[in-house]
């Protein structure tokens, strides 16, 4: 492992990418401590961490607790991406057309998502300013004029736009997916605070229960280890479909086709994107509900859409399964695969080229995705159930999801770095799972 890390730093291009990514993430972390003018963030630090503020704060790496310029985060971008990709499924012809235009279509979609993100960020910033000021008893905003709210919303929107720019810079010039890396950095930054809360609850004034609390912490460690091992295994597991290439015939001459190979289909083609989207999707109505604390509907949403509540947990798993299938077929296009194989004189033994191959790949992808979706759902709620049984702090409820995202993003980043090493004939350390 250490040799591989050394290999990373020996290659100038990879070293530059790593250092650039670290620099961008440091900028992000600094920004989480810069408070928005005309606000008193101290009042948020004493709020109940069991509410949606606590969950948003974990995902934002503490930005919301400080009500910093990055308090809105990149949730608007995630929401905008979900909406646009849903619209591309033959809902609006223009968006469907973009989906079929290749690189040009992706650029158009990306540009629209940027504009849509800014609009959503501004709306969310207004709502957060007003809502969290009400939660804090009117003490968050020091000047209650409408111009102050407008100014604060503008600053928060600019913060989201800057985060989006940081993510794009990391994607273009750094390592891995920039947006995922920002989420990763925020979650990692929140770990010490969550660990401290667990320590204070379990060991401060433990008295005669100290031994039982130690056993509980050991069990937590075993659950964490199981999640890490499970995520690594399922992220690397693939189903290899054998591919053969026909011999080309020209006159009396016969030419050997390409070497027989295989088509690898991952058990979880969607990665951890479904978990990120499901978390953001489930927190959105709770965030809105917090803006109207006196409403009976809002109280029901806040209580029942909690990750540890049976209704919230069921919706969470359902969203993960739905997004896993949705993104698996975005990442893997059976129709395009079958078409490319046919053009290259390739075929799956026993399966006719063309439509039959497409149907065969689709059937296998459905089965693999089912396994991946159930795994993601189970591994996401396992820590939630354990947290409920072990009576851990509410902030630890989101810890399982955080760990899943952290491990998934870290693994994808290591694969990206390893692919760079392989190009330069260095040996990586991620072993393949057959």
Predicted feature locations:
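N-terminal cationic and glycine-rich segments that engage phosphates or anionic surfaces
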Residues: 1-97, 101-434
